[in-house]
Amino acid sequence: MNLFQHKHQKLILQCYPAGKAVDKKPNSSELSYLLYYASTRRVKLEKVINFLKDKTHHDVGRNRTGNLQVTLAIIQELIKKCSENLNVFAFQVCYILQSIANTKDLALCKNVVKTFGVLCENLDGGLFTGDKEFIKIFTEVFQTLVSFGKDRSGVTQYDWQMISLMAINDISSCLSYNAAVGKKFIALSIPVLLQFIIANNPQSSILQRLKSNLHVEDDGKRLSRAHSQKSHSKIAQQIDDDFTNDSLTLTDITEKAFSSMKSFFNTNAASQISEVTRAVVQHNILNGTDLEWGVSFLELCITWIPVQLRFVSLSTLLATLGRINIEGNTKSNYNMQFQYARYLLGLLSSRVNMIGLSVSDIIQQLLSLQADLILKASDLDKSEISILTDIYSDCICSLTTHIYYFDQVPDSIQEILIKIDYILESSFVEDNNITSTGEQIQDLIIQLLDNISKIFLILKNKSSSINRNHVNLEHWDISLGLLAPQGDHDDNRKMIISTPQLINIQAKYLKVFDEFLNNELAVGNSKKSYDLLSKQSRLDPGSTAVEGVNKSDDSDNGKDFKKPDANQYITNQQNFISHFLMYIDKFFENYDSPNTQSVLLLVTVLKDMMNILGLNFLSNFIPFFHHWVMKVNRASNFTQRQKFKDTFAHIILYYMLKDLDEQYSHDLQNYCKSSKLFKQILDAVEYRKMQKFWVYGIDPSPSDLENIKGDRTIPTDANGNYIAIRIKPENIEEFACGNNFLIVWLHPQKQLLTEIEKSQVSTHMSTFNNDSRNTNMTVIMDQGSSALSGGADHGGHFVPPPEFVNHTGLSSESASSNSEKGLYTGLGLGTAGDITMIHSEILQYSQHFQERGLPHGNGFATILRTVDSVNSTNDGLIYTYDSKYLQSPRVSDLKDAMSTHRGIRLSKPNFGGANGTANMTDSASTSNGSVLNKNMQTTDVDSILSGLESEDEAAFVV
């Protein structure tokens, strides 16, 4: 022994037992003192590690295995004791490990990998950011250990493989320190892990593990997490014991491979998750791994990722597909795109939940991939394009139907419809800027519509315990342009879609929309007749049951769209029903002779809308009926377009009246089919058949109207000529006035909607609230007095109570209390005598209704007043208790309004100011629904007269 050894050398050498045994262990007391010595000062630590490095080199050269085992044990303890100064001696540790690993002695290499594990546990990011020499030697050590498991055979095969797997498992904790180095470690590790897993695990084994991770057992019982964690701990302990005792099995290797793979995915580093996902998929593709196996395995890997970061893997696949798409869809990258798309579909269609997933963003990217496949030039075959397109379609459907939040389905459908609208807009191009063909546009729009169809079909057949919001009619507003795209574009651009292609698009659109009506909108209560309890509660002003009934409409059973004014489909004329009918009118205007099959589909769709919407549909349809019906009493020659519209209008009105009795059986009691209007429809149809005005083949089979035998008697004039039969506005008005239920909700004088207010187009359905109406009218009642009652006080005629009156602000709602049968006759301009009589009635009845309230009016509300309170007045009220301030409209005012396209403003005092004082100079506009506010369509007298229905009206205008 050298008498002049330094103290640190003596302390180190004292730790080595004497002898040449191969399984030496350091002397414990001497090791403790050495650790204390090394930890006291940094310079001492440097001396210790440098001496150990030199001794290792000496012992390796002389094959002193026992001493090397002691050195590894000392290194492990030094790392643990001096971890805060690990950067001082980490390089030397790696050098020692590399030197010993190069001996390829199994016992030594087992201890090397354990020491490597301790080193990885105590490393931090500092060494990976600034010490290039350390990174180099650390990587060499890792590569050496990983290489031990490759192409091994014999009795020690499992031991060498376990060394590789343990090194890979240990390196997983160092991946996030340096992006470039971590990427290299992943590239070295993933192929080795997959090699072990693929060789020893068929797809059935992968699926079983996946099912276990999803906590779904064959018997339906959930797997206990505590039990699962305990099982994993026991497995890990068993592997360590077998590794120490040289008794490893294939099961140990398999479990360690899965455990190591899990350590790569089970991280909070998004970049690591992305890189590992890409490495797994890329390896499977390049090595020809069975696609179904690979998809199942990736699903298993996703279950190991923290749930809030699982979307990162999905986004990685989508980003890769995006890069491929930018490079161009060619045969050279078709297989890569196909496989990535299948992996993406596997994740989206699995039962793996992903929190934080941006559904709308992903759908937008998928739609872009679909669009580029069809629109962009490529050398792919049509079959290859079809395969990829179908995969993306399945991805969209799977994502949409895996419910994460209430509005997911509506949001997804809306994204698709917005894409369709954008594609349709792009079909209008300048002559020198054509990039796509009409056939490509057609194929893409039909594909996007098919996506929607698949979604509704899946939702119909898929039961879910998660409540969701349903797609509503208003979501489809943006898609109505498909019915008449030419009408929305009046610039110089031309549409590259041909007429046959447009007909194909429209046919697909109508079929998909009809599927929506029957599978998505018509759920629960909407399939049933109008709720009788709701009706009875509304007729009883003192009932409190109506609130509960209304709330039930929003339950899981679906909303009752047959309820009058559901979603304000009657009070608000700017609604989807009117918009849809307006675009149908544009549809007819675009064709001289519309396609029979397209019109047949339109009839089918509207019949389904009738069944769902009931009276709400009829109220919006009436203005369009008058617009479409031919004036057979004034002409005998009509275009084919006019015949189509006329036939279409009669078919819809016929089925509407036929269905109303069943939908509102308690209220109507078979009134519709026994009404004069119903008979007039049949006569009008028969007349058109006899005059060859009727268009056959647009009523779905079996057709009631076309199967009716021609045995009806059509009236003739004195010369024996058939009298032209045309249903006029007064016929429908008479029909509405004949039933107490219809009079409240049906508005025969509703104006024809000719323009859509863009601000009214909303993608979200309003709540069912029939109280969200105009309340310009106030009824002043003494405190403690009872509510208005119909019956005796009103001559025995039905007068709906305030809770039941539908306040629309429409002209048809204003009525004369003296009108025939006690019912309103609608608000027209009338003659000069009519205006004078109205003014007289106002003065006569104003005092009469002061205390008793008003039977009709625009916007009922109730204001209680005490005995000492000051009377408050209405805002724009036609009935007034301060009649001295009322200024009667003059005929000259009306004529002036018509000629200048302005509405009349009636001066009235303002009693509702902030200071309570009246302002005699204030004026109030006429009500929104007043004809005085309507702009005249034309100032040509002849055209005005031709549109009037009676001689009285014509005489008044003249």
Curated annotation (Swiss-Prot):
GO biological process terms held by the UniProt record: protein localization to plasma membrane
Superkingdom assignment: Eukaryota
Compositional bias ranges of the Basic and acidic residues kind: 550-564
Cellular component, GO annotation: plasma membrane
Region annotation (Disordered) ranges: 540-564
Pfam families for the chain: EFR3
PANTHER family per record: PROTEIN EFR3
Family note: Belongs to the EFR3 family.
Entry protein name: Protein EFR3
